[in-house]
Amino acid sequence: MKQHLKNTFLLLPIAASLPVQAQDKNESPNLVFIMADQWRGDALGCLDKEPVQTPHLDQLASEGVLFTNAVSCYPVSSPARGILMSGMYPMNNKVIGNCNSDTAPYGVELPETARCWSDVLKDKNYRTGYIGKWHLDSPYKPYVDTYNNRGETAWNEWCPPERRHGFDFWVAYGTYDNHLNPMYWETAAPRDSFFYAHKWGPEYEVDRAIEFLSEQKKSSS
């Protein structure tokens, strides 16, 4: 008998391929979203425009739908993610630029009151998880002690549970570009209790995603 994950949703904001099992007709589908941060639209092997090799993404394109004439209305990290999460333009969701200490005085961060599709899924009793870069909260003093908060502009910030828009499981950071040794906050970790993975970021995040999906499969069997 086939075993299905029950009402599971995972957002993985990195480039990786993860299988989602088919659902019976009357069941809610399992969902895995994969979001790449500021990925050039033509940096895909299947488009033959750059000397890149992306076999897993090419497979996703061949087995699904590939848009070749689409644009982002604001192609930098925070605004693009804010648009995808909320379905609103930056002027409506308040994320009109990257979240950092320079834009913080202007309220540039995703409001807790914004209604995201992850909130909707949570209301539908999905078990939700987020792994990777979030970058939708403004840093505030005293800044978190990471390398990218020690210069003139602070960038990195913890996201408290009430601002996670329905995500139960959380292994994420604000923004942090040392991908050879990335840092994260776990679900229940307070602001001052982040950890370093000591591993290539995308590899670590895929491992945690597979672990999350496996646990959901076991709990629903």
Placement of each model-derived feature along the sequence:
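Repetitive helical segments and hydrophobic/amphipathic motifs
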Residues: L12-A16
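Bacterial N-terminal signal peptides that target proteins for export
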Residues: M1-F9
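Formylglycine-dependent sulfatase
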Residues: T8-F9, V20-S221
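Intrinsic low-complexity/disordered segments
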Residues: M1, L18-V20
